[in-house]
């Protein structure tokens, strides 16, 4: 396949206006009418084409992460990690891989303010020599739920009320009162890190647990961490109101202007590594995306650096049509049995097929830079030039053959088919430890934000009591302080 065989490009622009089919247009100022004041004629093909195309310029926005901005650059491996993965782009220090990165807010629509208290997306597409690898994460290391079957529900709860189209936290607290594992993410959302100053000054995390595989099929669980070299910076509530009131696209503009000025954002990539044979020594499940791995027990290991040194050439082509999916992995990197990750592998690719069409991976920004070949043919908006006679496998008339075997962990999976939750939940320990690590003024800001949302008149007394009980199990003094603000009696 050769995606560059023929590609319409602005580099072929003519000096005069034409129709989409290339015919010259001699007047793009007036419609064709009967006389200077007469009715417009339907035979004015250029007018019809121009208006019809304008009416179809917008495509469905992402159901989540609709508001975002992209930039291009490279990833450089800086440390030898061949003892834990056979991924080619991590083959040796100094190896560089082109990337495109998209930062985003999560819940609100395209064009919404970038100062809203909301998780931020941090998605990286690596154009490796063995295909594209997409690492999708957030600026928080944990998520609200641990099972993908509840993903539509948690997004519905955070999205605006379907009656009023206003985001209301009573809906969030109602739904997540059934999911105490969500507490840990609330201790990031309502913390000072809940509103990053901009995209350049925020951490990134893979959130889910992935698997590194070596050439001899040795598997290890990994979590990914992006650390900005310029440090982490966040907006306080009053600052966010001021910044958002002046410019609702402040983070997008900051990213674009910084790169244009030669102030290239940079992040260091680290991994935490756990041998699956040792996972039972932890008091939590390493495949639970509502948990972090303690760095004193599982230290960060440096891998490489990410540098963004080019702005996108066209926002629509390289941001709106940019499509990520955790199902895109390369040899040496694989999924784990993390229930959220398993669901995301299907969901992200499916939403791209709906949003962009079945051939979304043919779009230049999504297509691999390496040579590739399969028998996926035709479909809506297929623009791949192909001249093969054989579109099946195997065939004695075509040279297509299987690639060399990719190392896959031989670990057996044994169990009964069942719908069940994980055994080691331990939902209150880590949020409590995080709260107690803060200075008193930071604790007070968290209490004010959390209690302020719980004070919504549609949050029932029963619901407030449930959340006070949860918070008390994280930290008894925290529960008492929240209860006093809400006039709720804490219970343990």
Swiss-Prot record:
Optimum pH is 8. GO terms for biological process: circadian rhythm; hydrogen peroxide catabolic process; response to abscisic acid; response to bacterium; response to heat; response to hydrogen peroxide; response to light stimulus; response to salt. One of its GO terms (molecular function) is catalase activity. The keyword Heme applies. Residues 1-23 are annotated as: Disordered. SMART domains: Catalase. It catalyses: 2 H2O2 = O2 + 2 H2O. The keyword Signal does not apply. Pfam families: Catalase (PF00199), Catalase-rel (PF06628). The modification Phosphotyrosine is found at residue 210. It is found in: Cytoplasm; Cell membrane. Occurs in almost all aerobically respiring organisms and serves to protect cells from the toxic effects of hydrogen peroxide. Involved in environmental stress response. Promotes drought stress tolerance and recovery. GO terms for cellular component: cytoplasm; peroxisome; plasma membrane. Signal peptide: none annotated. This is Catalase isozyme A. The active site is at 65, 138. Belongs to the catalase family. Optimum temperature is 30 degrees Celsius. Its EC number is 1.11.1.6. Strongly inhibited by beta-mercaptoethanol, sodium azide and potassium cyanide. Slightly repressed by 3-amino-1,2,4-triazole (3-AT). Activity is repressed proportionally to increased concentration of NaCl, KCl and MgCl(2), and, to a lower extent, of LiCl. Its main location: cytoplasm. Induction: Abundance in leaves follows a photoperiod-dependent circadian rhythm with an oscillating expression pattern peaking late in the light period. Inhibited by water stress. Repressed by abscisic acid (ABA), drought, high salinity (NaCl) and hydrogen peroxide (H(2)O(2)) treatments. Triggered by zinc oxide nanoparticles (ZnO NPs); this induction is reversed by sodium nitroprusside (SNP, a NO donor). Accumulates upon infection by the bacterial blight agent X.oryzae pv. Oryzae (Xoo) strain PXO99. Mostly expressed in young leaves (blades and sheaths) and seeds. Abundant in leaf sheath and moderately expressed in leaf blade and root. Also present at a high levels in panicles, but barely in culms. Observed in stems and anthers. Homotetramer. Interacts with STRK1 at the plasma membrane. Heme binds at residues 62, 102, 151, 344, 348, 355.
């Amino acid at each position: 396949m050769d995606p560059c065989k023929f590609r319409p490009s602005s580099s072929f622009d003519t000096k005069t206006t034409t129709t989409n089919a290339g015919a010259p247009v001699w007047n793009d100022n007036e419609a064709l009418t009967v006389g200077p004041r007469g009715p417009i004629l339907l035979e004015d093909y250029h007018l019809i084409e121009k208006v019809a195309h304008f009416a179809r310029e917008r495509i469905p926005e992402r159901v989540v992460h609709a508001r975002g901005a992209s930039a291009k650059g490279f990833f450089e491996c800086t440390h030898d990690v061949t003892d834990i993965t056979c991924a080619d782009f991590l083959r040796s220090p100094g190896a560089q891989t082109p990337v495109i990165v998209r930062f985003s807010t999560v819940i609100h629509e395209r064009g919404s303010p970038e100062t809203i208290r909301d998780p931020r997306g941090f998605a990286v597409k690596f154009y490796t020599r063995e295909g594209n690898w997409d690492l999708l994460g957030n600026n928080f290391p944990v998520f609200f739920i641990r099972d993908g079957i509840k993903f539509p529900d948690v997004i519905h709860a955070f999205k605006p009320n379907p009656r009023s189209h206003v985001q209301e936290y009573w809906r969030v607290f109602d739904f997540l009162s059934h999911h105490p594992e969500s507490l840990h993410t609330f201790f990031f959302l309502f913390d000072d890190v809940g509103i990053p100053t901009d995209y350049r000054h925020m951490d990134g995390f893979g959130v889910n647990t992935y698997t590194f595989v070596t050439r001899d099929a040795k598997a290890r669980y990994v979590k990914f961490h992006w650390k900005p070299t310029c440090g982490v910076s966040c907006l306080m509530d009053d600052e966010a109101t001021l910044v958002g009131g002046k410019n609702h696209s402040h983070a997008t503009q900051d990213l674009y202007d910084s790169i244009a000025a030669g102030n290239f954002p940079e992040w260091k990539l680290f991994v935490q590594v756990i041998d699956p044979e040792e996972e039972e020594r932890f008091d939590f499940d390493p495949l639970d995306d509502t948990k972090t791995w303690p760095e004193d027990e599982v230290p960060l290991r440096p891998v490489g650096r990410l540098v963004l040194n080019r702005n996108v050439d066209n926002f629509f082509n390289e941001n709106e049509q940019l499509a990520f999916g955790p199902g895109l992995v390369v040899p040496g990197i694989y999924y784990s049995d993390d229930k959220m990750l398993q669901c995301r592998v299907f969901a992200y690719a499916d939403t791209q097929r709906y949003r962009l069409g079945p051939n979304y991976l043919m779009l230049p920004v999504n297509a691999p830079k390496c040579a590739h070949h399969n028998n996926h043919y035709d479909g809506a908006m297929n623009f791949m030039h192909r001249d093969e006679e054989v579109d099946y496998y195997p065939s004695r008339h075509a040279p297509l053959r299987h690639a060399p075997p990719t190392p896959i962990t031989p670990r057996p999976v044994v169990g009964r088919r069942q719908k069940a939750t994980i055994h080691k939940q331990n939902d209150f320990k880590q949020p409590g430890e995080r709260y107690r690590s803060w200075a008193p003024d930071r604790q007070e800001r968290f209490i004010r934000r959390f209690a302020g949302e719980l004070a919504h008149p549609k949050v029932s007394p029963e619901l407030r009591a449930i959340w006070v009980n949860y918070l008390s199990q994280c930290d008894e003094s925290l529960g008492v302080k929240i209860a006093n603000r809400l006039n709720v009696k804490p219970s343990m």
